[in-house]
């Protein structure tokens, strides 16, 4: 599990984001099959440091046998954090919940045979913390997504719009599942750099998720169409002029 500490340094007027300005500290949890061998999440096979087949062998080691979401949330709360974000699905396409869409999730495809996201969400809400869900826009495992590895591209959207349409339906099905089942306070998207805003259909994404929760917050990784910025790799020395 890779845990990151996120400092909130925003100064926004919108009422819905007041809580995140006051929260200051977030615990962002990366958890997936990459935890089995302790290798880079998704990028290890995308950049071909390891073969895709070897990467997926980690499914057999993902047992979640020592998983105790209540202990996790207790530790998060003791840290002083007021909200937490967890990877519902990273770029490798491995979903932590029992998704009815796609063919790669912890319940159906891993040794654990568990939906590991639901008990974590329940523990977060029971303890009065705000919930954020990380969701990768790219899905490098899905057969109708454009990219598989840095050297393997399945197709171009312009040449095969019908395949992109299939992927879009799959993506929206999964977003609907997460929205309906967990109703997060924050959506933490990632991977927007692979395609343009209109290709991702960012406005539709936001409209659908806001219909479920008008007060939900979006990070900036919807091609800049979010409520706050999320720099990566380092913490700025000076407060950014943009929303952060």
Give names to the regions the model predicted.
Residues 7-244:
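Mature catalytic domains of secreted/periplasmic carbohydrate-active enzymes
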């Amino acid at each position: 599990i890779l845990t990151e500490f996120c400092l909130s340094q925003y100064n926004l007027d919108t009422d819905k984001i007041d809580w995140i300005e006051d929260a200051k500290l977030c615990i962002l949890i990366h958890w997936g099959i990459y935890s089995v061998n302790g290798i880079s999440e998704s990028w290890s096979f995308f950049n071909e440091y390891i073969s895709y087949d070897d990467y997926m062998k980690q499914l057999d080691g993902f047992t979640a046998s020592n998983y105790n979401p209540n202990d996790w949330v207790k530790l998060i709360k003791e840290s002083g954090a007021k909200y937490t974000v967890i990877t519902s699905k990273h770029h490798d396409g491995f979903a932590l919940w029992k998704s009815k869409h796609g063919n790669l999730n912890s319940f159906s495809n891993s040794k654990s045979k568990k939906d590991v996201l639901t008990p974590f969400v329940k523990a977060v809400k029971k303890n009065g913390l705000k919930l954020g869900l990380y969701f990768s826009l790219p899905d490098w495992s899905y057969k109708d997504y454009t990219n598989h590895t840095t050297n393997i591209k399945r197709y171009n959207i312009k040449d095969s719009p019908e395949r992109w349409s299939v992927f879009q339906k799959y993506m929206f099905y999964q977003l609907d599942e997460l929205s309906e089942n967990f109703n997060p306070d924050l959506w933490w998207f990632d991977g927007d750099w692979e395609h343009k805003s209109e290709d991702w259909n960012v406005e539709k994404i936001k409209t659908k998720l806001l219909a479920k929760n008008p007060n939900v917050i979006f990070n900036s990784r919807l091609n800049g169409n979010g409520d706050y910025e999320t720099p990566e790799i380092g913490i700025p020395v000076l407060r950014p002029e943009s929303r952060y």
